[in-house]
């Protein structure tokens, strides 16, 4: 049986450096020698884009690219010249889909107004619970991830975001924007504390652990 695909991206908004710390947690865990990491590598093919907006990061922009574009509003019909990374990533996704079934796309972000870590997903009328299962599992593995704050909708105003554009492209339930507060948590062991870089890296690790639980893949700990 062909391995299923997982696509994870971050830093489309240059100022959201907390997304890079979550991504570091993802990558460090994925390349580790733990039984869980081996199980993930044995069962999935991962495509990872750590920085979607490198020009914006290098030049110190907060939200936009060098062309003054919010790239997370340009996924629907990206321009090869103005939005080259979006254009290339959509081509990569299409190629990936031809190779194998894609199980999940997750785009990592930072949030400046809300506390905790949470997800935005898509509401699928025919199967409304299908997009909620993975975030619910994640909430049971990490007490500063909030399922209650997670939202699921298909808003016309958000059609240009990766979450909705990739849903139109892939037509699968597990397409998420994961948002980490610039502040901290108001629940669990980190209540009333700021998130540290270690906390954010832990969140990246928990994301992959939730994938193990969700997919039911065996973990050989011998």
Predicted regions span which residues?
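Structured catalytic-domain cores with a bias toward divalent-metal coordination
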Residues: 1-222
